[in-house]
């Protein structure tokens, strides 16, 4: 019995002991600016990945799957409207110059219904999306290295960063919740709590000084 326990270093390895928690990472505004200011003109694949990251950030953390399915007709009279595929919630975003610059830089074919060149064919959208997501996240790792960012950069970091920066600027939870398309403010509170450990870290420092 003792031998069995000794060999099994983690007896709870296959036991579910709680609710899964996704690790969420955010970067500060100064890191976003570093990414934006990179000269990637000689690296078109990295340039595209960087611009998709920025587009997500500019559009209040729009998820990549929603970006992929944006249609040209979704942009009318200076307002971009789309329905979140995750929740079905309809969102409206004021179209800004920074968004237009990315759309102009990465124009789709004239006869393409899509606003961004993520889905390029009218068939097998799921496979196209998965491949584009993989390539973009892979290239973002290289972008992060060039920008001197230590955390693994992914498209979701853009969403997490928008929420974190909004919170740091004392934007009300209700506004952040609406901006991100959450179904409740409670969801946003949980989301933000998982992003920011600075308050807890600060409390721990005070305790350790006692």
Regions found by a protein language model. Give the residues of each.
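Basic, Lys/Arg- and aromatic-enriched nucleic-acid-binding interface segment
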Residues: 4-64
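Conserved tyrosine-mediated DNA breakage-rejoining catalytic core shared by Y-recombinases
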Residues: 7, 13-14, 69-105
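Catalytic-site neighborhood detector that most strongly recognizes the C-terminal catalytic loop/helix
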Residues: 18, 84-88, 180-205
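Active-site/catalytic core of tyrosine-dependent DNA strand-transfer enzymes
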Residues: 26-33, 96-150
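Short, basic (Lys/Arg/His-rich) helix/loop patches that form interaction surfaces
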Residues: 37-44, 109, 137-178
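Short, contiguous acidic/charged loop-to-helix segments that flank catalytic cores in large enzymes
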Residues: 40-44, 81-94, 123-132, 151-157
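Short, polar N-cap/turn motifs at the start of nucleic acid-interacting alpha helices
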Residues: 73-81, 149-151, 171-190
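DNA/chromatin major-groove-contacting recognition/catalytic segments
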Residues: 92-97, 101, 105-106, 193-210
């Amino acid at each position: 019995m003792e031998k069995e326990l000794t060999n099994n270093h983690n007896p709870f390895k296959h036991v579910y002991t709680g609710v899964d928690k996704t690790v969420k990472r955010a970067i500060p505004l100064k890191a976003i600016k570093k990414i934006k200011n990179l000269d990637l003109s000689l690296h078109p694949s990295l340039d595209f990945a960087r611009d998709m990251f920025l587009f997500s950030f500019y559009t209040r953390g729009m998820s990549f799957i929603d970006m992929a399915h944006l249609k040209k007709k979704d942009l009318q009279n200076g307002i971009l409207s789309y329905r979140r595929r995750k929740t079905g919630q309809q969102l409206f975003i004021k179209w800004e110059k920074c968004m237009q610059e990315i759309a102009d830089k990465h124009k789709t074919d004239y006869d393409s219904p899509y606003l961004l060149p993520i889905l390029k064919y009218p068939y097998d959208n799921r496979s196209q999306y998965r491949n584009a997501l993989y390539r973009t996240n892979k290239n973002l790792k290289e972008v992060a290295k060039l920008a001197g960012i230590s955390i693994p950069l992914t498209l979701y970091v853009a969403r997490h960063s928008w929420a974190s920066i909004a919170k740091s600027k004392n934007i009300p939870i209700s506004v952040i919740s609406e901006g991100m398309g959450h179904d409740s403010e409670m969801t946003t509170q949980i989301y933000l709590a998982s992003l920011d450990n600075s308050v807890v870290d600060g409390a721990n420092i005070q305790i350790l000084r006692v």
